[in-house]
Amino acid sequence: MPKILTFNEDARRALEHGVNALANAVKVTIGPRGRNVVIDKHYGAATITNDGVTIAREIELEDPYENLGAQLAKEVATKTNDVAGDGTTTATVLAQEMVRFGLKQVTAGAAPLTLKLGIEAAVEAVSAALLKQAIEVNSKETIAQVAAISAQDPQVGELIAEAIDKIGKDGVITVEESQTLGLDLELTEGMQFDKGYISPYFVTDAEAQEAVLEDAYVLLYPGKISALNEILPVLEQVVQERKPLLIIAEEVEGEALSTLVVNSIRKTFQVVAVKAPGFGDRRKALLQDIAVLTGGQVVASEVGLSLDAVTLADLGRARRVVVDKDNTTIVDGVGEASSIADRVRQLKQEIEVSDSDWDREKLQERLAKLAGGVAVIRVGAATEVELKERKHRLEDAVSATRAAIEEGIIAGGGSALTHVASVLDDGLGRTGDELAGVRIVRRALDAPLSWIARNAGLEGAVIVSKVKELEPGRGYNAATGEYTDLIAAGVIDPVKVTRSAVANAASIAALLITTEGLVVEKPAEPAPQDGHGHGHGHSHPQGPGF
């Protein structure tokens, strides 16, 4: 494809317009008085949401140069969501302000790479200051407050706190759709391990980028699978049962993988392949844990089993399996309770006799996975649109709660960023353009609080000025319209969420202000009206050529 190019100020301004377009759509949702955004879908009902990353993912601009800017801003939201699970709107607002102030400096003649050094130094100082302010999360009440703020629903906060109280801080929480109204919490036998799908073509839910298998068979194999004829017999048996299949193996590659991918794309049958967790003897032990949980067998020569001789009786079963790019969660395996209890007892004995701290730690991880179970929160609503929106908020709340447990909490409502900006007042000893870079971050840190106030119908600059006069920890509660001790009032944010928002916003802003040229594909010429001789072949599938 031929390319078109633009350079210098024109390139940077086009990127800024793209960033602004996306940020303007997202920032109206920030704060307790934030509004919703309605997203049209090519299929099904429209989505109504106030989740920043959900809105950002839907935005594509017509102008190719501006679209590059929008995609960079989208990266801020998605990266923050991946790392911390929340704070995507805050990150987007920060990025917009840093880009705005940064481009003003570049236009005035500042050296972009020197500005970048100042921005990076400022982010490091802010991150350290936020960690210093962190308050450890160790009570059920605090966990409930974190979740309630994220979901904007006290009932959700109580439910997530109850779930973590029952399964432990390292336990697994999944969110499922329910046919009934309201919220419901259920504890089930289950396990999660840190390996995701081998190929994204296995995804069944494109929006969540997950593969979800209901009432699935589970094949456990400690070796590599590359030849199709090795797994063909078991695939044929599973297809006849009309059930999905989860394959957990050291590796699935070559002819075997391509066949599974083709069948998944064509929806001949539902299958997901993931790499087995761990290495060496630990991998074998983890596979055996999964076998006990699902009531299956590890297909290994040591027990007289080979892949081409596997029957359905050798496979495990689970009510539900959820696989994303990083994790696999198995819920409600059909393994016998007595077998699971025996395995738990065995692990406890191994922990007692182990004389290696590393081995003991890994055994305790296995015990937590096997004995902790999975908390399933079922969410229902009157309409499909409301159901999707509530499920999004619940998933964000679970992620925010995990982030809070990991690094602690600080005062929310944007006030922590406004107060922590004071560490940059002296310019960190920088001079010239580096000092200008520090000041870019310093000015941008007020933006989240300003927009929380503006969405509540107030003048942002006035609220920011007033909050700066208050002690750290105190700020403006937009839900009640009062200046108060935010931590005591339960208006709190996870430190990890806030740090990620600042770091990711600064990263993209620094990239954008150091950009000097853009290269995009030239738009295709419109086809002639009679349709002869042109335009044929443009409807071929975009994936592999099947």
Swiss-Prot record:
Reactions catalysed, as given in the entry: ATP + H2O + a folded polypeptide = ADP + phosphate + an unfolded polypeptide
Pfam families xrefs: Cpn60_TCP1
Principal subcellular localization: cytoplasm
Gene Ontology process terms (BP): protein refolding
Residues involved in ATP binding: 29-32, 86-90, 413, 477-479, 493
UniProt key word Chaperone: yes
Top-rank lineage group of the source organism: Bacteria
EC number: 5.6.1.7
Compartment annotation: Cytoplasm
Record region (Disordered): 523-546
Top-level EC class: isomerase
MF GO annotations: ATP binding; ATP-dependent protein folding chaperone; isomerase activity; unfolded protein binding
Any single Gene Ontology cellular-component annotation: cytoplasm
Keyword terms, alphabetized: ATP-binding, Chaperone, Cytoplasm, Isomerase, Nucleotide-binding
Its biological purpose: Together with its co-chaperonin GroES, plays an essential role in assisting protein folding. The GroEL-GroES system forms a nano-cage that allows encapsulation of the non-native substrate proteins and provides a physical environment optimized to promote and accelerate protein folding.
Family according to the record: Belongs to the chaperonin (HSP60) family.
Subunit structure: Forms a cylinder of 14 subunits composed of two heptameric rings stacked back-to-back. Interacts with the co-chaperonin GroES.
Name the record gives this protein: Chaperonin GroEL 1
Organism field: Frankia casuarinae (strain DSM 45818 / CECT 9043 / HFP020203 / CcI3)
Gene behind this protein: groEL1
